[in-house]
Amino acid sequence: MKASVIVSVALGASMCLATTLAELPACSQACLQSMLGKAAELGCPPHDPGCLCSHPDFTNGLRDCTKEACPGENIEKVVEEGQKACKDMGGAPGSSTGAPTTGTGSGTATGTPTSGSGSETTAPPTSGSGSAPAPTSGGHSTPYTTIPAGPTVITSGTNVITTSRPATTLYTEVSGSQSGSESGSSTGSGSESTSGPEPTSATSSEGGSSPSSTEGSGGSGGSGGSETSGSGNGPSPTPSQGMAPKATGLGVAGAIGLVALLAL
C-alpha cells in the first residue's frame, strides 16, 4: 500500500513539474532544471525538495541565471514559477502533503542555515617621521597663549584698511642651561746672555793696555828692538760701547809717540 502511495505521489509531482516547465520559455526552463539539480551543492539531502526550495541560494541562483542567460525574460515570473514547481514537488516550505488515498499528514521541512563570510582588509597604519630643531642643552619651550584669528583695522586719516590676522600661538623662551669649560696652559723658557765690559773703572789688559812693538835697524847692521807697554784709565764704557776700541786708540797713540822719539 505504501509503495503504491509513493509511486502515485511521484507521478503526480512529475506531471505538475512538467506543467510548470511548459509555462516557461526554453531558456528559463533550463535555469530552473539546473537549480533543481543543485540540492547536494546547497547542502540538502537527496529527495528533500523542501530543503532545496527554502534555501536562499535557490531563489538567488534562479534569478541570476535568468538575468545572465535569458535577457529580456521576466525574471520575477521565472522565480514565481520556480517556487510553484517546488510546491508541486512537495517541497513547499514548512509543509508536505500525503497521498489523498490515506488522508492527510503533516510534516516539517528542515533547512540548513547559511553563513556568509567576508574579509575586511584594513590598511596598515602608516608612520611618519620628521625633524625639528631641538633646543640646546635639553631646553624646551611651551605654548602659553594663542591669539585668535580676526580682522585688523588700520585707520590713517580718512582711509580705513582692514586686513585679516591669522591665529598666532606664543611660546615661552627656550629653557635650559649651557655649561662648558676651557683650559689651557702655555709654558716657555728662554735665556738671553750678553757679554760686554762691565761698567767698572778697574785697569785691565782689556780696558787699558795694548802691547805694541817696533823694530828698527841700526847703522852698524845690528838689530835692536824695544817693547813698551802702557796703561791708562778712562771712563767706564756704557753697555752700548765696548772698551776695546778705546784701548786700541790709546795703544796707537803710544806707538806713534815712540816712533817720534826714535826719529829724534
UniProtKB/Swiss-Prot annotation:
Keywords of the record: Cell membrane, Cell wall, Disulfide bond, Glycoprotein, GPI-anchor, Heme, Iron, Lipoprotein, Membrane, Metal-binding, Secreted, Signal
Recorded superkingdom: Eukaryota
Lipidation positions, renumbered (GPI-anchor amidated serine): 240
Positions with biased composition (Low complexity): 94-139, 172-215
Membrane topology label: Lipid-anchor; GPI-anchor
PTMs per UniProt: The GPI-anchor is attached to the protein in the endoplasmic reticulum and serves to target the protein to the cell surface. There, the glucosamine-inositol phospholipid moiety is cleaved off and the GPI-modified mannoprotein is covalently attached via its lipidless GPI glycan remnant to the 1,6-beta-glucan of the outer cell wall layer.
Signal sequence annotation: 1-22
GO CC annotations on file: extracellular region; plasma membrane; side of membrane
Domain CFEM: 23-112
Comment on protein domains: The CFEM domain is involved in heme-binding and contains 8 cysteines and is found in proteins from several pathogenic fungi, including both human and plant pathogens. The CFEM domain adopts a novel helical-basket fold that consists of six alpha-helices, and is uniquely stabilized by four disulfide bonds formed by its 8 signature cysteines.
Functional summary from the UniProt entry: GPI-anchored cell wall protein involved in stabilizing the cell wall.
PANTHER family hit by this protein: CFEM DOMAIN PROTEIN (AFU_ORTHOLOGUE AFUA_6G14090) (PTHR37928:SF1)
Protein known as: GPI-anchored hemophore ARB_01545
Organism: Arthroderma benhamiae (strain ATCC MYA-4681 / CBS 112371)
